[in-house]
Design a protein with these regions (language model features):
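Bacterial Sec-dependent N-terminal signal peptides
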Residues: 1-24, 255, 309
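Subset of outer-membrane beta-barrel
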Residues: 21-393
Length: 393
């Protein structure tokens, strides 16, 4: 593994926590790794998933989708290199498990681990470089969710999340690890198959408000950090041309529900910079819809947009593409994604690749992401999408 000098370390941390910033009012939060897409299926479709069909990684996007899962239980395993062009030991790992209790309800759990790699700290003393030791900062979350069908077409879910962030370094006695709790509230709609232009179709929509919880406190003398409370709203439609060919169109909108940074001045009215107001997370959520100094226009610029396409052939091969867009003043993340999936009986292998179209470099640019989905048991009570369509004809 590659050891990094302390000076370079802060550049990496800046990229991890504030990547893409080109405006002083870019919204930043603690534990931003919670917003990194872990599964290659969603990553290949412009990093969306709140209203796509249920899969093993629905825990991150919309746990209410598990109520519509076609398999009785499944496991998801994924590995995402981060800043791979700079270092080789920063990564996001994820494992997810779900199980259907019956045809109406299901539960799921997941573990997400983010490693910032080995970091070498040195200090220049009297013309000599003194070794201050090596650290391996990391963060993790442990989730548990429950989903319930309220009708044949609609479900809701709630998830609880334990968040732990260990970014403390031995050479800084003022810092410590931090922890918090988060809650997700999600809803999902999946229509019965219907006819559309001589083809059968299924419409889906979803909403998920995730990471609702208290702020993180790394230093008792400093301002606390908001966790990335986020709202996703999306919709999509699958068109079934025949028993073998299916094409899905999806779109999604997302907004961080944390305060917009505001200008801060000293007692002499000299400008000091931008900082988020020191308020609790509930007030932060409420004010996040109307606190932008630039008014409605700036509020709308805080909404990101993603569109995605997925083509499936005989449930054995998938091809995907998508586009993600963020305002230039709010981070300037813009990129095209592509991906593919291969279903080998009970194992599905997904791959994705990201092409940045922004002048701001993306930490995942030119990185191949992959994930595995293990479908452990086919449910007898939940028919496949093809069977559902056949039964409706």
């Amino acid at each position: 593994m590659r050891a990094l000098h302390v000076t370079l370390t802060y550049l990496i941390l800046g990229a991890v926590f504030c990547f893409g910033q080109n405006s002083n009012r870019v919204i930043t939060t603690g534990v931003p790794f919670l917003m990194i897409t872990a599964d290659a299926r969603a990553a290949g479709m412009g990093e969306l998933g709140v209203a796509t069909s249920a899969d093993n990684y629905s825990q991150h996007w919309n746990p209410a989708k598990y109520a519509f899962a076609e398999n009785e239980k499944g496991v998801g395993l994924s590995y995402t290199p981060y800043l791979s062009k700079l270092v080789d030991d920063i990564f996001l790992g994820n494992i997810t498990f779900y199980k259907k209790v019956d045809d109406r309800s299901s539960w799921a759990t997941s573990l997400r681990y983010f490693s910032l790699g080995d970091i070498q700290f040195n200090e220049f003393i009297a013309g000599t470089i003194v070794d201050q030791g090596m650290e391996r900062p990391s963060e993790l979350t442990l989730d548990l969710s429950y989903a319930l069908k309220l009708s044949n077409e609609f479900s809701m879910a709630v998830a609880g999340r334990f968040i732990y962030s260990d970014l403390k370094i031995a050479v800084d006695a003022d810092t410590s690890s931090a922890s918090s709790l988060g809650v997700d509230v999600a809803a999902f709609y999946q229509s019965q198959p219907f006819e559309l232009s001589s083809n059968m179709a299924v419409f889906r929509s979803g909403v998920n408000i995730s990471n609702i919880g208290p702020r993180l406190n790394y230093d008792s003398g400093a301002q606390k950090s908001f966790i990335p409370t986020n709202m996703r709203i999306g919709a999509g439609i699958d068109l079934f041309f025949d028993d073998a060919n299916r094409l899905g169109f999806y779109t999604e909108f997302s907004k961080l529900l944390v305060p917009t940074p505001v200008a801060v001045y000293d007692s002499n009215k000299d400008f000091l910079g931008y900082r988020q107001p020191d308020i609790d997370f509930i007030n932060g959520i409420i004010t996040s819809f109307s606190d932008a100094p630039g008014g409605l226009g700036e509020e709308l610029s805080e909404i990101t947009t993603a569109i995605g396409l997925e083509y499936r052939f005989q449930e054995s091969f998938s091809a995907r593409t998508g586009f993600f867009n963020e305002s230039q003043d709010k981070g300037s993340r813009r990129y095209l994604t592509m991906g593919a999936g291969f279903n080998l009986d009970f194992i599905e292998i997904d791959l994705s690749y990201l092409f940045s179209t922004s002048r701001v470099r993306n930490p995942l640019e030119n990185t191949i992401r992959f994930s595995l989905s293990l479908n452990l048991d086919q449910s007898a009570s939940q028919p496949s999408s093809k069977d559902s369509l056949d039964n409706s004809l």
